[in-house]
A protein has these predicted regions:
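Conserved P-loop NTPase-based nucleic-acid remodeling module centered on helicase motor cores
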Residues: 1-68, 73, 81-86
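Switch/connector loops and helix/strand junctions flanking conserved nucleotide-binding motifs
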Residues: 17-20, 177-180, 203
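Short acidic (Asp/Glu) and glycine-rich catalytic loops that position anionic groups and cofactors
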Residues: 25-26, 46, 169-172, 195
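Single conserved hydrophobic/aromatic residue that forms the stacking wall/gate
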Residues: 193-203
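Short, conserved catalytic or adaptor-binding loops enriched in Gly and charged residues
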Residues: 1-2, 191-195
Length: 203
């Protein structure tokens, strides 16, 4: 392939986001040696916070509340972006506050969960245009396979990373979407056509 191949960044969304986040961890209050928690550790942290806030884990199973928080992250929603109506009566009406406390505890532990890898990089890109511009200079062409299985956070990350080049190629089949249970939004295919960048991105 030649020496140019050494400049290619190849990996999953989360692997590439983790690579970026290690470089810019300080911008979100982490250090570069942060730990990525597995599901058991996530649930353990969340349960501790629930007990401290008098939220009964028997009435509100940890996996249920943790699943809702992860779905919010899959949609690119930080605690301040979650609407009151959307949180509803979950966790005695305090799920937004629990999400906020969970994020604060992860920062104190110098840890992230799977959803944070993209969520934190969305925060970095939006708050630090100089960092985003650096990646625009480094990454000029992007190709995504199995695009039908991307979630909203991945779509937003792509939109920001594509930047002024608009050199984005996505391969996907809406009939083959199998990860809806994990936050995948087959509607992301339609967003490529309806977004304000659609004419530049091509079809």
């Amino acid at each position: 392939v030649g020496p140019m191949a050494e400049q290619v960044w190849l990996g999953t969304f989360h692997a590439l986001a983790a690579r970026m986040l290690r470089r810019h961890a300080d911008l979100v209050g982490l250090s570069s040696d942060f730990t990525i928690l597995d599901m058991d550790d996530q649930n353990r942290v969340l349960k501790q916070l629930m007990v401290a806030d008098d939220i009964d884990p028997k009435r509100w199973p940890v996996r249920l509340l943790g699943g809702v928080i992860q779905r919010w992250k899959d949609r690119g929603l930080t605690p301040d972006k979650v609407g009151v109506a959307e949180a509803g009566d979950l966790a005695n009406g305090r799920l937004r506050q629990l999400y906020e406390a969970y994020q604060a505890r992860l920062l104190a532990l110098n840890a992230v969960d799977f959803g944070d890898l993209l969520l934190h990089m969305l925060t970095v890109f939006r708050a630090h245009p100089d960092v985003l511009a650096e990646y625009h200079g480094r990454i000029t062409h992007i190709m995504v396979d199995e695009y039908q299985d991307t979630n909203v956070a991945q779509y937003l990350w792509l939109r920001l990373l594509t930047g002024p080049h608009h050199n984005l190629c996505c391969v996907g089949d809406d009939d083959q979407s199998i990860y809806g249970w994990r936050g995948a939004e087959v509607g992301n295919i339609c967003l490529l056509y309806t977004s304000d960048a659609a004419d530049d991105l091509g079809r």
